[in-house]
C-alpha cells in the first residue's frame, strides 16, 4: 500500500482566483483547518512577492505545528533567501522552486535558451539545497514541454539536489492517458524515480484536473497538489477532496492511503467557501449540497431500504452531519465552544469570549441558531472590523425625484470617526457612493450577491461583493446582518478596506 502526500495550495494558487484576497487572520484560520484535515504540506504563499505575503507566510509557519509549510520561489537567489527568512520558524520547512520548460515560455516569457534554463535550474536548486532539506522543483508548463528536454530538466534538478519533482499541467492542457504516459516516461528515464517524490499539479481548464491527478498517482506519483473546492485561477485546480475520497472509496484499485481526515472536508469546504466568497455548486462532487440528495422516487425508495443502493459515499464520511442539533439562548459557553471546534474554528480565549457574547445576542433574536448561523457569526465578526475601518452608523433616507440618500459613519483604527453623505438612484448605490467618498477611492463594483443564511423570517442576510480598484485588482467583502442594507454596507466597507490597506505586489510574471 503506497502513501500519497497531499500538498495544499489554497493559500497561494487558490488566492490567484479573481476577487479572492485572504487577510493574515483568514489565512491562519484556513491553515489551522488544513492542519486538522491532515494536509501534509501547506503552500502558504510567495514570500518575495510583497511584504504582506511575506508576513502571511511567516505567520503561518509560526502557527502550524504538525505539518510542513512551504513557500514559492523563482529561480532567483533573492527569492530563495526571502523564503528561507519567512519559513525559519516552521517546524518542517520546505521550498518550492519553479522555472518554465516549454518552448513558448522560454522564448516569449523567459527569453532564455534551453542551455540557460538548465544552468539556472542546476545553480538555484543547489543553492536552495544548502538552506532546505526538502526542495521541490516544478518545470512550469511541463505538459506542453518537449518530452526529451523536460526529462533532461528534471534530471538536472535531481542531480542538483531536488528531493521532490512536481509536474504541472499549468494550463489544463493534458488528459489522463497522456499524463499517465508522461509519468511512465519519467519512471523509465529517471534512474532515481523511486527515490524521489514525484507530484502532480493540475488545472481544470478542460475539466480533467481530478482525473489527471489520479492518473499520475496510478503511474507513480506520490504527492498530489491542489486546493479545497478546486478554487484557483481560470477554471481552478485539482479539488483535493475529490482525490482523497476517490482514493478511499477505490482503495481496491489505487492501493493507496493518506493522512487525510476525511470527515474534516465539510468544515474545510465551508470555511474556504465563505472566506473566498465562492459558493460551492450544489452539484459539486463530494461536498456539494446535492451530493447526497435523491429526488427520483425509485432512488429514494432504494436509499431508505439500504443506502448502498445509490450512495457510494456516506455523508458522515466527509463530515456532513444531517442530525446536528441547533443551539439556542439557553446553550452554555462549553456547548458553544465545543460546536466551534467541531466546525473547525480555533479561537483564543478573548475571541471565544467576544464570539460567545455575540452568539447570545443572536440567540435572543432567533429561535434557533443553526450551524450556518454560527459560520456567519464568525465571519460577521471578522468582516465588521477590517484592518482599519468599522461601520458605526448607517442611515438611509428618501430625498426626492426617486433619489435615495445615505449617511455613513466609520471608525478608523485610531478611534477617529469620519462621516459623510451621498445620494444614488437606489439605497445600495447611495451607501456605496458615501463609502467611496469616505475612503477617497474610485472603485468599481464587479459583483453583488445576497443570500439568506437560513430559512425563516428571522434569517440573517449574507452579502458578498467584489470590487475592482484602479490597479485592476479585485477584492472580496462579506457582510452579515439581519438588515440587508447594513449587511451590504459591511460587505462593501470590508472590500474597500482591503483595497486601501493592501500593499501592491511586485510586478512579476503570473505564477501558474
From Swiss-Prot:
The species this protein was found in: Listeria welshimeri serovar 6b (strain ATCC 35897 / DSM 20650 / CCUG 15529 / CIP 8149 / NCTC 11857 / SLCC 5334 / V8)
Sorted UniProt keywords: Amino-acid biosynthesis, Branched-chain amino acid biosynthesis, Cytoplasm, Leucine biosynthesis, Manganese, Metal-binding, Transferase
* Functional description taken from the UniProt entry: Catalyzes the condensation of the acetyl group of acetyl-CoA with 3-methyl-2-oxobutanoate (2-ketoisovalerate) to form 3-carboxy-3-hydroxy-4-methylpentanoate (2-isopropylmalate).
Keyword set includes Hydrolase: no
- Domain Pyruvate carboxyltransferase intervals: 4-266
Q: In which pathway does it act?
A: Amino-acid biosynthesis; L-leucine biosynthesis; L-leucine from 3-methyl-2-oxobutanoate: step 1/4
Q: Name one Pfam family in it.
A: HMGL-like
Subunit (UniProt): Homodimer.
Instruction: Establish whether keyword RNA-binding is in the entry.
Output: no
Q: Name one GO biological process term.
A: L-leucine biosynthetic process
Cofactor(s), by name: Mn(2+)
Q: What is this protein called?
A: 2-isopropylmalate synthase
- Of which family is this protein a member? Belongs to the alpha-IPM synthase/homocitrate synthase family. LeuA type 1 subfamily.
Q: Where is this region: Regulatory domain?
A: 390-512
Which positions are annotated as binding Mn(2+)?
A: 13, 201, 203, 237
CDD domains attached here? DRE_TIM_IPMS
Amino acid at each position: 500500500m503506497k502513501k500519497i502526500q497531499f500538498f495544499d495550495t489554497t493559500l497561494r494558487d487558490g488566492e490567484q482566483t479573481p476577487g479572492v484576497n485572504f487577510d493574515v487572520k483568514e489565512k491562519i484560520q484556513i491553515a489551522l483547518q488544513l492542519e486538522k484535515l491532515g494536509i501534509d504540506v501547506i503552500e502558504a504563499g510567495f514570500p518575495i512577492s510583497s511584504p504582506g505575503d511575506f508576513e502571511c507566510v511567516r505567520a503561518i509557519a509560526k502557527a502550524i505545528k504538525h505539518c510542513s509549510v512551504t513557500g514559492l520561489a523563482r529561480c532567483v537567489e533573492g527569492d530563495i533567501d526571502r523564503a528561507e527568512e519567512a519559513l525559519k520558524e516552521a517546524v518542517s520547512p520546505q521550498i518550492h522552486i519553479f522555472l518554465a520548460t516549454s518552448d513558448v515560455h522560454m522564448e516569449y516569457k523567459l527569453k532564455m535558451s534551453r542551455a540557460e534554463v538548465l544552468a539556472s535550474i542546476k545553480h538555484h536548486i543547489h543553492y536552495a539545497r544548502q538552506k532546505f532539506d526538502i526542495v521541490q522543483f516544478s518545470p512550469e508548463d511541463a505538459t506542453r514541454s518537449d518530452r526529451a528536454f523536460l526529462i533532461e530538466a528534471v534530471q538536472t534538478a535531481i542531480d542538483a539536489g531536488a528531493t521532490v519533482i512536481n509536474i504541472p499541467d499549468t494550463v489544463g492542457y493534458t488528459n489522463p492517458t497522456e499524463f499517465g504516459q508522461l509519468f511512465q516516461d519519467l519512471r523509465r528515464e529517471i534512474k532515481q524515480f523511486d527515490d524521489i517524490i514525484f507530484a502532480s499539479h493540475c488545472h481544470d481548464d478542460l475539466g480533467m484536473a481530478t482525473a489527471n491527478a489520479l492518473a499520475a498517482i496510478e503511474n507513480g506519483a506520490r504527492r498530489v497538489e491542489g486546493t479545497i473546492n478546486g478554487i484557483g485561477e481560470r477554471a481552478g485546480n485539482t479539488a483535493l477532496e475529490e482525490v482523497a475520497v476517490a482514493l478511499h472509496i477505490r482503495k481496491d484499485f489505487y492501493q493507496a492511503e493518506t493522512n487525510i481526515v476525511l470527515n474534516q472536508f465539510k468544515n474545510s469546504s465551508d470555511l474556504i467557501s465563505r472566506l473566498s466568497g465562492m459558493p460551492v455548486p450544489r452539484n459539486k462532487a463530494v461536498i456539494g449540497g446535492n451530493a447526497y440528495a435523491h429526488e427520483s422516487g425509485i432512488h429514494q425508495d432504494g436509499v431508505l431500504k439500504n443506502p448502498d443502493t445509490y450512495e457510494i459515499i456516506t455523508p458522515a464520511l466527509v463530515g456532513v452531519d444531517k442530525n446536528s442539533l441547533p443551539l439556542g439562548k439557553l446553550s452554555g459557553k462549553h456547548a458553544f465552544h465545543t460546536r466551534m471546534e467541531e466546525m473547525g474554528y480555533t479561537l483564543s480565549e478573548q475571541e471565544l469570549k467576544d464570539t460567545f457574547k455575540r452568539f447570545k445576542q443572536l440567540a435572543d433574536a432567533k429561535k434557533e441558531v443553526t450551524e450556518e448561523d454560527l459560520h456567519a457569526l464568525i465571519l460577521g465578526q471578522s468582516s465588521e472590523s477590517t484592518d482599519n475601518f468599522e461601520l458605526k452608523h448607517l442611515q438611509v433616507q428618501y430625498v426626492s425625484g426617486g433619489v435615495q440618500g445615505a449617511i455613513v459613519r466609520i471608525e478608523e483604527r485610531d478611534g477617529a470617526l469620519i462621516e459623510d453623505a451621498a445620494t444614488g438612484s437606489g439605497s445600495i448605490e447611495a451607501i456605496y457612493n458615501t463609502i467611496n467618498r469616505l475612503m477617497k477611492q474610485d472603485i468599481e463594483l464587479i459583483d453583488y450577491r445576497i443570500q439568506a443564511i437560513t430559512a425563516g423570517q428571522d434569517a440573517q442576510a449574507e452579502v458578498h461583493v467584489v470590487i475592482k480598484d484602479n490597479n485592476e485588482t479585485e477584492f472580496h467583502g462579506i457582510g452579515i446582518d439581519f438588515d440587508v442594507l447594513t449587511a451590504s454596507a459591511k460587505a462593501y466597507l470590508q472590500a474597500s478596506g482591503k483595497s486601501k490597506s493592501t500593499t501592491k505586489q511586485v510586478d512579476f510574471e503570473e505564477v501558474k
